[in-house]
Amino acid sequence: MPELPEVETVRRGLQPAMEGATIVRAETRRKDLRFPFQTDFVARLEGQAVTGLGRRAKYLLADLASGDVLLMHLGMSGSFRVIDAAGVTVPGDFHRPRGEDRVHDHVRFTMSSRAEIVFNDPRRFGYMKIVARSALGDEPLLKGLGPEPLGNEFDAAVLAHGCRNRKTSLKAALLDQRVVAGLGNIYVCEALFRARLSPRRLAATLAMKTGAPSERAERLVGAIRDVLNQAIEAGGSSLRDHRQTTGELGYFQHSFQVYDREGDKCRTPACKGAVKRFTQNGRSTFWCPVCQT
């Protein structure tokens, strides 16, 4: 599933085509994706200007002039492509090659610029929903999400507070969207490696007995920010479904230190360990047991 860097890459790719333009036509080619489309989905989109395109965790949020917000989630295999008036895919981020799977083009927006934005989703785990801006705080899909890891509200004290009473592993806590929003398996493995922290470590050890953040929490926040920013700069990670809206792959997978590198030598200077893999809460965890403690 796309994680925060991939979704942010999508947002940046769609932004030039959507922001400031009006949705002239909205077309759904089936009655549902993961969930059924609202009965007034098309009517609430057509004729509306997109005043802003944001992101919350792994969700895209398009603000409409009507006061509604179009909430979009990529699911497992969802992707967007932007096509200009001449039928040429224009720069942006996150789509599959044109012509390969148009049968899976499920949603199409025609913009006032005559550009078209197409949502393709072979596995149909993605979804779209229109929510009134005034009700966004109570939206079940967003309610309860933790702080954005790249936002000003996220720091060592916030992370330590979110983990202080948890009896789960550190990795499990970081994957809990209530603790911090937008992280997934790839970037949690990478951040823990960079912070030299074991994924098996008890999450509560990020806080000292006084409740203040430990030095581990400081290291981990820095590592999370670094790995996410580097991944966004690289256009995300392309393992299975992720491509940029030009059809290009993201390149951060070439910078993985541990993820999907089982058996490789640890990349920490002077460390003689090797990357190991084990199953943790149903997911593969990659780490170096020598330098991650």
From Swiss-Prot:
Highest taxon of source: Bacteria
Annotated SUPFAM superfamilies: Glucocorticoid receptor-like (DNA-binding domain), N-terminal domain of MutM-like DNA repair proteins, S13-like H2TH domain
Reactions the enzyme catalyzes: Hydrolysis of DNA containing ring-opened 7-methylguanine residues, releasing 2,6-diamino-4-hydroxy-5-(N-methyl)formamidopyrimidine; 2'-deoxyribonucleotide-(2'-deoxyribose 5'-phosphate)-2'-deoxyribonucleotide-DNA = a 3'-end 2'-deoxyribonucleotide-(2,3-dehydro-2,3-deoxyribose 5'-phosphate)-DNA + a 5'-end 5'-phospho-2'-deoxyribonucleoside-DNA + H(+)
GO molecular-function terms, A-Z: 8-oxo-7,8-dihydroguanine DNA N-glycosylase activity; class I DNA-(apurinic or apyrimidinic site) endonuclease activity; damaged DNA binding; zinc ion binding
Signal sequence bounds: none
Keywords from the UniProt entry: DNA damage, DNA repair, DNA-binding, Glycosidase, Hydrolase, Lyase, Metal-binding, Multifunctional enzyme, Zinc, Zinc-finger
PROSITE patterns: FPG_CAT, ZF_FPG_1, ZF_FPG_2
Keyword Calcium found: no
An example Gene Ontology biological process: base-excision repair
Catalytic residues identified in the record: 2-3, 58, 283
Cofactor requirement: Zn(2+)
Binding site for DNA: 104, 123, 166
Free-text comment on the cofactor: Binds 1 zinc ion per subunit.
Ranges annotated as FPG-type zinc finger: 257-293
Pfam families membership: Fapy_DNA_glyco (PF01149), H2TH (PF06831)
Protein family (similarity comment): Belongs to the FPG family.
Xref: NCBIfam families: fpg, PRK01103.1
HAMAP family assigned to the protein according to its UniProt record, in alphabetical order: Fapy_DNA_glycosyl (MF_00103)
Protein name as annotated: Formamidopyrimidine-DNA glycosylase
Organism for this UniProt entry: Nitrobacter winogradskyi (strain ATCC 25391 / DSM 10237 / CIP 104748 / NCIMB 11846 / Nb-255)
